[in-house]
Amino acid sequence: NTEIKTVAVMGSMHEIGFFEGSIDENTSCRPESFYGIAKNALREVTAILAKQEKKTFMWLRGFYIVGNSQYGSSIFSKISAAAERGDKEFPFTMGLNQFDFLDYDVFCKYVSAAITQDKVNGIINICSGRPERLSDRVERFIKENDYNIKLKYGAFPDRPYDSKAIWGNDTKIKSIMEGVSTIIKK
């Protein structure tokens, strides 16, 4: 369709594969999970088609979204469901790995801001820009939601294929958000 000027797709940090450190738009992707492989293939095909059709391409790379819906598959959804059931303990790893967490409302603001502007495109990390220990974020989540549940540390082993510390470079999303605040001030 010639009326479509921009193609924006929700990506995932899982398309990167095992990596430790800060991820930016130039970080090589070597996914090892079927989900990561599928997301990476979608990103590559969409980028090629957008270029062929002369469309602006935005790949919105999501990281770890924190929300209290009990219907998702994230650790936060599982804890919410367990708390709703009245469970007093939640089996957990040691929680030492560090990830980039973003609260759902902030995630939504970032995605909305990214797709409604035309200055920054390509791969845009929808992220906080900093790593945080899983145990710290989960404990804070439990407290924020006033859940009466405790983590049972060490019930599960840490997964050997999980990165010890992985987070997004937030340069592009910061630039977008600065542009949004400039427009609002005018």
Q: What do the predicted segments below correspond to?
A:
Residues N1, V45-T46, Y110, A114:
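Hydrophobic positions on the long internal alpha-helix
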Residues S12-F18, Y64-Q70, P131:
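Active-site proximal helix/loop that lines the substrate pocket
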Residues R85-D87, P91-G95, F99-K186:
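C-terminal substrate-binding subdomain of Rossmann-fold SDR/epimerase-dehydratase oxidoreductases
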Residues N1-F34:
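Conserved Rossmann-fold NAD(P)-dependent oxidoreductase catalytic core, especially the SDR/UDP-sugar
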Residues F34, A38-A41:
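Active-site helix of classical SDR
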Residues E44-Q98, Y104-V106, F141:
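NAD(P)-dependent short-chain dehydrogenase/reductase
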Residues T6-M10, F57, F90, L151:
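Hydrophobic/aromatic residues located in beta-strands of well-ordered beta-sheets
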Residues N1-K5, L49, D118:
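A short helix-coil junction within the Rossmann-fold of NAD(P)-dependent oxidoreductases
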